[in-house]
Amino acid sequence: MYNKENVFAKIITKNLPAEIIYEDKQILAFKDIAPIAPVHIIVIPKNEYIDYTDFISKASIDEIKHFFSKIADIANEAGLDKVGYRLITNKGEKSGQTIFHFHFHIIGGKKLIGLINNND
């Protein structure tokens, strides 16, 4: 069940601050508060989705298309289109998901090495 008190829900309602870099009726993008690269942007839908599976199963085709096309636009605006970037989403606690509102990380601005961190 979606928790309306999660951090991203509070950012959407402006009850928590964020350095917003893009916003429209469906999407919000903002800088990560603990970046792991020079460019680290979080992109979220404004509707209530817990994770990728929830988003894909409940969102309209138009909303899905808009979300993913805007991720590309945001990455390009950040200057990452020519140098490359990584897109990450996590699903569930064991994947590393800590905020249960569907989101993508756009990470770039430096050479990214490795795919996962195996700290047991």
UniProtKB/Swiss-Prot annotation:
Gene3D superfamilies: HIT-like. This is Uncharacterized HIT-like protein RP317. Residues 7-120 form the HIT domain. A motif (Histidine triad motif) lies at residues 101-105. PROSITE patterns: HIT_1, HIT_2. One of its GO terms (molecular function) is catalytic activity. InterPro entries: Histidine_triad_CS (IPR019808), Histidine_triad_HIT (IPR001310), HIT-like (IPR011146), HIT-like_sf (IPR036265).
